[in-house]
């Protein structure tokens, strides 16, 4: 088998050799801060019959490994969920939206991915090339904006307002403002500690 060198865990220790997270099409300010898109979710409308085609051909997509789940009929859920592992991240694909009538609409779907982690992988673009002919319309449903500061987490604080606030002390201090999965939700945490970076970085 092919053996490739790279960052690895040995006896539970992570070497501090990474100096920054991966970015794709990021914007860097003069102060050294970095803006990037850390998650994208697209709502998909499939051409008639193409949802069924994807259901039977998704297993041919090139990736490290894949997982697939078929859900019970539950209004508002997804009939099929696919996960394609690409390196240290993955791409999620949903096929078949469950309507309030409990009918499965195979012409609806979604795709979710982190461009910072998968856009540098050629297999991701090949996956999109296979998906594109099946889609009649794609609409941006959600994106997460990452703002990275080359500063210690101890020097940063989240300004509270009337939204729900929570603070967690575990592997550094993590603060939350707002309701998860809703517009304006904010999370401030020690990115350096999370990724075992050699320098200081707060996201």
Regions found by a protein language model. Give the residues of each.
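Structured, helix-rich domain cores that form ligand/interaction pockets
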Residues: 1-202
């Amino acid at each position: 088998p092919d053996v490739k060198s790279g960052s690895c865990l040995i006896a539970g220790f992570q070497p501090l050799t990474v100096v920054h997270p991966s970015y794709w099409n990021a914007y860097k300010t003069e102060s050294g801060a970095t803006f990037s898109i850390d998650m994208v979710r697209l709502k998909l409308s499939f051409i008639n019959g193409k949802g069924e085609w994807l259901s039977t051909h998704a297993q041919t997509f090139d990736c490290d490994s894949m997982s697939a789940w078929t859900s019970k009929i539950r209004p508002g859920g997804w009939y099929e969920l696919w996960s394609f592992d690409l390196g240290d991240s993955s791409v999620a694909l949903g096929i078949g939206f469950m309507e309030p009538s409990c009918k499965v609409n195979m012409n609806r779907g979604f795709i979710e991915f982190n461009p910072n982690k998968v856009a540098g992988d050629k297999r991701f673009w090949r996956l999109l090339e296979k998906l594109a002919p099946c889609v009649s319309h794609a609409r941006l449903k959600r994106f997460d904006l990452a703002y990275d500061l080359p500063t210690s987490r101890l020097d940063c604080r989240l300004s509270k307002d009337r939204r729900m606030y929570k603070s967690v002390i575990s592997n550094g201090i993590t603060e939350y403002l707002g309701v998860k999965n809703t517009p304006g939700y904010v999370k401030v945490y020690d990115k350096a500690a999370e990724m075992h970076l050699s320098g200081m970085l707060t996201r």
